Amino acid sequence: MKRSLHLFLLLVALCSVVAACGNSSSSSATSTPSSIKLNIFAAASLTESFTQIATAYHQSHPDVTITNNFNGSQLLEQQIANGAPADVFASADMANMMKASNAGLVGDAKVFVKNRLVVIIPVGNPGQIMSLKDLARKGVKIDLEADTVPAGHYSRQALMNMSQSPDYGANFGSSVLANVVSQEENVKAVVQKVQLGEVDAGFVYRTDVTAAVASKLTILDIPDPFNVIAQYPIAVVKSSANAAAAQSFVDYVLSMAGEGILAKYHFIAVNP
């Protein structure tokens, strides 16, 4: 009888220990912080640089998972206005950021980098374009972003600037625009068509000529007096469910680490 009682008590004790361990394990699991998710809405021209920035930021903030949404700034602004779950907005122009700001969609914006336009032609040069003046030659096929796209707006400004110069002539801009055979929603679409040889030339940012496509393209620089320098602002979206983490990401972009990554992709520093 005593032996049976001892075995019973021992069994109860073992069950208590197992239960305690189970509770401890459960408590530990529930105390583990869940991953923070950030949705970054960034201009298409930031694709390569922000992909690397997101990776670098995650390495120092392993609890934060970043999803990038790259597209034309005008489309991103519309998506945010329509309620898309964005935490950070990085635009390729001030106009779309101001539109978002005036609608109360974003917080204070800061310019974090600049960019410049170039003309790209495919290797092999099917259009026989030797200089910018050749863009006005009848029959040349040019791809350009739509006027609502920052790069498209800047390109038209540059053409207007060149038309003011006797080196190009008053009709230069209109002649170039008459050769436009397609208008795209973002710069990456222009790069794609040019590198495939579907058109003879296209207007993009210098940063769009990345290592992945450089061997398939030739760059024609637009002289500084006529070029348009794009300013890129960044801001936290007010509806963000993770505003503190979103601000931390913005701060990283503005930091020396972020500037260093952007410089690798030929962006122009705000204060060079």
Regions found by a protein language model. Give the residues of each.
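Periplasmic-binding protein-like
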Residues: 87-91
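Exported/periplasmic ABC-transporter solute-binding proteins
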Residues: 21-60, 65, 74, 78-82, ...
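Bacterial N-terminal signal peptides that target proteins for export
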Residues: 1-8
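Central helical "cap/lid" subdomain
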Residues: 104-110
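Residue-level signal for mature regions of secreted extracellular proteins and peptides
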Residues: 14-15
